[in-house]
């Protein structure tokens, strides 16, 4: 059989399209055969069953007694109970309200008319997620017209030279910079180091760090994170 034709036949057999999601997956070139596929059916059924349990709110992290529900944040309607659903909606509404007030100037820094820049401090997913969104949605400014929103900078490691470069780029605009510190636990060492270095940068310019900083953390650690910011 012609090689191209055999590839096409295999593609037709193994191309997977999920109705309603717009997601398609081509596994035809992965090199497995039918016997392997058949042998995996039991394992796949177990995996799908475990996923269904997670969707239903099963505890997946016994150390912290936590469920896994990152995707509930995108669609609170699928959260396993009303309490979680209401908490998610409440927090999302609060975030939207805060963001709107920052962008329209109702929340402003102590020494400037409004915030023009955002400095996000986080490690791992606390920085990677926002970086992905910022780079994907930033867009390209039109000629002689700047983009709306805050120009965003990231401190996502403990490299002192990297931090110094960012502080240099911000320069005098540090007084117009909103600092966002993200740590689920409220005590991530790398994130804390970045926050302390940034606080020192503010101090060197006689700026009130606490007046321009906000923390995103787990509810259990809110007071500790606030004490660190205000300290």
Question: Where do the PLM segments sit?
Answer:
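Glycine-rich phosphate-binding loops that contact phosphosugars or nucleotide phosphates
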Residues: 100, 113-224
């Amino acid at each position: 059989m012609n090689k191209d034709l055999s590839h096409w036949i295999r593609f037709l057999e193994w191309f997977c399209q999920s109705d309603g999601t717009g997601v398609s997956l081509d596994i035809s070139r992965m090199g497995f055969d039918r016997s392997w596929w058949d042998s995996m059916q039991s394992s796949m059924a177990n995996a799908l069953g475990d996923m269904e349990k997670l969707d239903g709110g099963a505890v997946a992290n016994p150390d912290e007694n936590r469920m896994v529900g990152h995707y509930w944040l995108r669609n609170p309607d699928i959260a396993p109970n009303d309490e979680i659903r209401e908490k998610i909606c409440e927090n999302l509404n609060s975030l939207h309200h805060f963001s709107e007030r920052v962008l329209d100037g109702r929340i402003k820094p102590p020494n400037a008319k409004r915030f023009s820049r955002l400095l996000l401090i986080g490690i791992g997913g606390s920085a990677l997620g926002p970086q992905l969104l910022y780079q994907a949605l930033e867009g390209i400014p039109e000629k002689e017209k700047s983009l709306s929103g805050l120009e965003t900078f990231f401190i996502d490691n403990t490299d002192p030279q990297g931090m110094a470069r960012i502080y240099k780029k911000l320069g005098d605009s540090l007084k117009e910079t909103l600092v966002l510190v993200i740590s689920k636990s409220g005590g991530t060492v790398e994130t804390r180091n970045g926050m302390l270095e940034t606080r020192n940068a503010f101090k060197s310019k006689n700026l009130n760090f606490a007046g321009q900083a906000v923390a995103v953390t787990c509810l259990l650690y809110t007071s500790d994170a606030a004490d660190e910011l205000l300290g």
